[in-house]
Design a protein with these regions (language model features):
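Glycine-rich phosphate/adenosyl-contacting loop at the front of the ribokinase-like
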Residues: 1-62, 67-71, 77-78, 246-248
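Conserved phosphate-binding/catalytic region of the ribokinase-like
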Residues: 1-6, 172-177, 202-309
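Short beta-strand scaffold segments in enzyme catalytic cores
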Residues: 48, 95-99, 108, 228-232
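Alpha-helix C-terminal capping segments
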Residues: 48-56, 100, 263-268
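A glycine-rich helix N-cap at a beta->alpha junction
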Residues: 75-90
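Conserved phosphate-binding/catalytic loop of the ribokinase/pfkB sugar-kinase fold
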Residues: 88, 98-137, 142
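Conserved beta-alpha-beta core of the PfkB/ribokinase-like small-molecule kinase fold
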Residues: 107, 124, 136-207, 227-229
Length: 309
């Protein structure tokens, strides 16, 4: 039985991205620099990140019966992601409208879920049960219904699958879901929204991490942008510095981290090694414009890490 695969339960979107600087204020129109229309969604991004990082990857999600269906499914399949568990539903595919500041690389995003909210708990349970002998790690985010997230946690707990929860966009989840979470990976703002603790330094990050662990998560991994990440677990607290790079687009950094983290854990890496590869993947991603086009391959991550020694 080969369980080196990763299953990703999450959103599949068409990303409509505008680049320019400065970003417009309310009521203001500005002239931009560039535009892209590509596959996106936190689920799809993490699936591509995982498969590029070297893991057999299975996408579980939903798209609509519109012109963006072929764009999204073709892009996933072209990367080698297994799309047999992607449902095609009536209506529109999910859309993300992204604006990226061309100078800082920072962004803001508005998501219209569409088909992503038509994914059901039963759909997901059926797919995960079928995949349980091929995967050991499951990634999930909060761009699908919370009832789906809860069912994913239940199935992972029952089937002894390692679940990585990316709680974005941040919103409360059912208390009973936490016991199925192996790693919860919020950024500082998401950690603050969920815990009520303003994460500003190591001490506050540790307090926020303990909040997640007290509710049943095994490990909390709080990402801090250019300050790296802090991992809080049963063996204590470990701080990982970020790799210095010049960002041009930070949109997919968190998804690159999650995908590389999941792929590394599925191949048997330690949490420490997997976290370092996740940070490297995130660092490489912010140096390239676009969401899925920016996600690095395993060889690029290897070379980047080798250059840091």
């Amino acid at each position: 039985m080969d369980q080196t695969g990763v299953a990703v339960v999450g959103s599949i979107n068409a990303d409509v991205t505008a680049f320019g600087s400065p970003l417009p204020r309310p009521g203001e129109t500005v002239i931009g620099d560039d535009f892209s229309l590509v596959l996106g969604g936190k689920g799809a991004n993490q699936a591509i990140a995982a498969v590029r990082a070297g893991a057999p990857t299975y996408m579980i999600g939903a798209v609509g019966e519109d012109k963006f269906r072929d764009l999204t499914l073709t892009a996933l399949a072209a990367e080698g992601v297994d799309i047999s568990a992607v449902r095609i539903t009536p209506g529109a595919t999910g859309i993300a409208h992204i604006r990226v500041d061309a100078l800082s690389g920072q962004n803001n995003i508005m998501i219209i879920p569409n088909a992503n909210y038509r994914l059901t708990p039963d759909d997901v349970e059926s797919s995960l049960t079928e995949l349980r002998d091929r995967v050991s790690v499951v990634l999930v985010q909060l761009e699908v219904p919370l009832s789906v997230v809860q069912r994913v946690a239940e199935v992972c707990h029952t089937c002894d699958l390692r679940l990585i929860l990316d709680p974005a966009p941040a919103q409360p989840i059912a208390s009973e879901a936490w016991r199925g979470v192996s790693v919860v990976k919020p950024n500082e703002l998401e950690a603050q929204v969920l815990t009520g603790i303003a994460v500003k330094d190591r001490r506050s990050a540790e307090l926020a991490g303990r909040w997640f662990i007290d509710r049943g998560a095994a490990v909390a991994m709080i990402t801090r942008g250019e300050r790296g990440a802090i991992v809080i677990g049963p063996d204590g607290v470990e701080e990982y510095p970020a790799f210095p790079v010049t960002p041009v687009d930070t949109t997919a950094a968190g998804d690159a981290f999650s995908g590389a983290l999941g792929a590394s854990l599925a191949r048997g890496a330690s949490l420490s090694e997997a976290a370092r590869r996740g940070l490297a993947a995130g660092a490489l991603t912010v140096t390239v414009r676009g969401t899925s086009p920016s996600l690095p391959r395993a060889a690029a991550i290897d070379s980047f890490l080798a250059a840091q020694c």
